Amino acid sequence: MKIIYQEQQNECGICVIGMLANAIHDEKYVHDELLEQINLPPNGLSLFEMESYGKKFGLEINSYQLTFQELKELDSKFIIVHFKDHFVIVKNKHENSWEVYDPAKGKYLLTDEKLEKLWTGYAATVAKAFKEIPPVNKSNFFSNFFDFNLVTFYVFIELIIIGISTLLATASRTIITNTVDFGTAVNLVVLVVYFSCLKGLNLLLQVILQLIRNFLFWKQYRGYLGWIIQSLQQKSFVYFSNKSPNQLIERQFYLKEVLSFFNFYIPNLIISCVVALIIGVLIGINQLEFLLIAIAQIVVNAGLFCYDFFFTKKITKKEIPYVELQNKISLQLDENLREEQNKKRFNFLMLNFRKALLQNQNINNQKEINRLTIENIKSFFQQGFDFAILGLGVIGIIEQRYQLSFLFYVFGIQSLFSTYATRIVQFGAAINIYHYCREKLVNLFIETKKDEGIKVNWQCPDEISLENLSVTLNQHVDLANLSLKIKNETVIFGQNGSGKSTFLKILTGRGFEYTGNIKFNNVDLKRCSKEQLFENVYYLKGQNLMQTEANDFGFSEALFNNQNPHIYQLLFDAGVQNQTKLSSGQKQILQLFLLSNIKNKVILLDECMNAIAPEIKNRVYQLLVKPLTLNNFVVLVEHDLSFASEAQNKINLTNYLRNS
């Protein structure tokens, strides 16, 4: 553990927090940074304040008043110990020796006797916890994701590589000048060996740089991804109810692009500006025509790059809908082949699938043709510029304006100049992508919709009352001015399209607009927060049977808590103990069984018994549904009412339909 030394007597607490954060989270806090982040009282931090600030730095600090023997028995890697007006960190290194990290004196050892004399009887254990995530927005986005030290390191490494390349180009001029009189064969050997070594060294340096970059990039990426996932764990239910899982997963792509912008494009811009300026001046001083060729090469490369960028952007916009359609139809085909046998629907899906595949293939062909065309055009112009430089060089040598060595020198630095100058243009496209990805990442941290409800004291209702409830079911049929009193264990039934499922979904408080009032006892449904309703109102749909094994959703725990042998017999008779593959009826029995330990909730069952065999349906109702009504408020929607002879109340929703 590295010591952070205090500069004032009251700073020991913040230094201790900083040292622990650095050791546990591999952070790099320094003294001045800690002073900025912690509001330091004149008398220093107390143990209670250290507990509070510890959460900000990802530390779970719990303080105690102990005997010395209890201190020795504490199971914690690091322990904060309070001396008189001072805090230190200790580790029990040996049986009678303590390793002390003191922000005032540094690192030293204390025996049990000496530590006991200095100790005041107060200590705190330290454990790793989630760091508090500050709100991320556009104004602080740069400071949260930009690592100045890392960018400086990248620039430094690449400058070394460029310096070596420039020195080698300069050395080539000297070597050729000094060997020009040795004869043609010697010159040829020198040039071949020299340029082979030059190219090999340059490639080696580039590979080393890329390996270092990749290692540091992925280390940084994993850290930021963990930071984002940690921040998501602090979000409310409302946040997740307004964001699909795909929105959260795709942020990994945006994170990569943002980090690439900071760690690749910004260093490249800095390097490119420096190199283009210095080498451009060097070329211009030696020979203006070579500078003009380099500028022409930059213009052509920039034009080709811009065309490729905008073409790819345009074609990708066309591609996305067809890719989404292809994925959607793939899922439907999978369902058709696994869950049903419908040749007519299969042919229809295959027809649309082929159309989507053909469109995607055409788009991919266009992208590939564009890529090859750009590469060939770029190669053609590169060859043309090389011949132009060579031609000018030969003419210059014939006219004795400069020597052969100068031509090789210009070849080297002119190529370097055009390469790095073109990167400046590429930076413009990177900015475009960065702004888009930044917007997406910022939106990840923002809860755009607030929970407008008010958290009331939840109590399982004895009655749900509807007062002048009106809701449109479709264009012409609705429930208008519906006033009802719904009791526990009520069964809702009615003709198809009478709004039974819609009626239950309205009671969840999510997804449907209605007028009038819905009250749980005397509490209006609209006064409850979405998070509260999600926690206390269960809506189960009989057709939504995603679980395929009895192990799903805590089957073993439910079995352990069950005290009724008749339920064990029911599960055995229904074959639910066969955990490899369940039928629809078995899944419904499992679904109801897993509710058996729920209490003080509103449970809405939407045809959750329609697939259960008629001979055991009444047993299922008596053993799994009816017990739920003892500790919960249960409303059912069913077509088959043979089991519901004992239900307290039945409501035929067909009688309340109105044609508009």
From Swiss-Prot:
It is a multi-pass membrane protein. Keywords: ATP-binding, Cell membrane, Hydrolase, Membrane, Nucleotide-binding, Protease, Thiol protease, Transmembrane, Transmembrane helix, Transport. It is found in: Cell membrane. The active site is at residue 12. One of its GO terms (molecular function) is ATP hydrolysis activity. The keyword Cytoplasm does not apply. Residues 464-657 form the ABC transporter domain. InterPro entries: ABC1_TM_sf (IPR036640), ABC_transporter-like_ATP-bd (IPR003439), P-loop_NTPase (IPR027417), Peptidase_C39 (IPR005074). Pfam families: ABC_tran, Peptidase_C39. Disulfide bonds: none annotated. ATP binds at residues 494-501. It comes from the Bacteria. One of its GO terms (biological process) is proteolysis. GO terms for cellular component: plasma membrane. Residues 6-126 form the Peptidase C39 domain. The chain crosses the membrane at residues 150-170, 188-208, 265-285, 290-310, 379-399, 402-422. Belongs to the ABC transporter superfamily. This is Putative ABC transporter ATP-binding MG390. It comes from Mycoplasma genitalium (strain ATCC 33530 / DSM 19775 / NCTC 10195 / G37).
